[in-house]
Amino acid sequence: MFQFNFNDFILFIYNLFFPAVRILALFSTAPLFNSKFIEKKIKLIMAFVISWIFSSFLPKVNIAIFSVDGILIIIEQMLIGILLGLTMQLIFSSIFMSGEIISLQMGLSFSSLFDFNSRSNLSALSHFVHIFLLLLFLEWNGHIWMLSALFDTFITIPIQKIYLDPNIFLKVVNFSKYIFFDSIMLLFPIIIVQLLLNLSIGILNRVAPQISILSLGFTVTLLVGIILLYFFIPIFPSSCIVIFRRLQSFVLTLFNS
């Protein structure tokens, strides 16, 4: 006959709740999972299902949720999840910024679309780069790797009353400059060619104003930009995979002491 044990039930809730806090914090900042198109109820269900799976492999936690230690652990889980998600978001933000620069140089900044995630108008080229990057991330099984990296954090930083090393935040800041540099270098040839083209158009307009080169400037920059993108797109996936792997190596060592 089945006997209900209230203490075992409370212990089950504790072991389900604390991992779910870290998972929900990751979902709030990590790429793909932080999409506004995914309903909050779906995210909540996913978080508790993943937490239930993870809890089977983790040490048991017997700390009351509403105690002082429990509140400190909740804050710690939120910090770990948010930090991990923001670290993964760096690649998308940096490449997204590069797309905005190219769009501005091509004269496509006026062609904007409303982005539901950022609640702002963004250029069509930036939307294209963002969607392309998301598809590459899925093709690379980035969503699975993200959950695997999250599970590894439960091994390196178990659910208990500990204090995060402040150097972790410095690691993320130092890593962000390398990611932004790699992302700019990824699209650097297009940026340089467009810059030289705009500079040449400006010089020609000053040397021979009767030609009225500025009337053709927009058409020329747009055409050259499209041609450059045509030759650049085939090498874009392999370059992004290199950046993804660099992110993977960094995340594996982020929470290691």
Swiss-Prot record:
Might you name a Gene Ontology BP term for this protein? protein targeting
Q: Which Pfam families match?
A: Bac_export_1
| Location(s) in or outside the cell | Cell membrane; Bacterial flagellum basal body
Membrane spanning stretches:
12-34, 44-66, 79-101, 121-138, 145-164, 179-201, 214-236
In terms of InterPro entries, this protein maps to: FliR, T3SS_IM_R
Q: Please provide the record's keywords in A-Z order.
A: Bacterial flagellum, Cell membrane, Membrane, Transmembrane, Transmembrane helix
Instruction: Name one cellular component (GO) term.
Output: bacterial-type flagellum basal body
Question: Where would one find coiled-coil regions in this protein?
Answer: none
What topology does the record note for this protein and the membrane? Multi-pass membrane protein
Which PANTHER family does this chain map to?
FLAGELLAR BIOSYNTHETIC PROTEIN FLIR
Indicate the family of this protein: Belongs to the FliR/MopE/SpaR family.
Question: What biological function has been recorded for the protein in this entry?
Answer: Role in flagellar biosynthesis.
Name under which the protein is recorded: Flagellar biosynthetic protein FliR
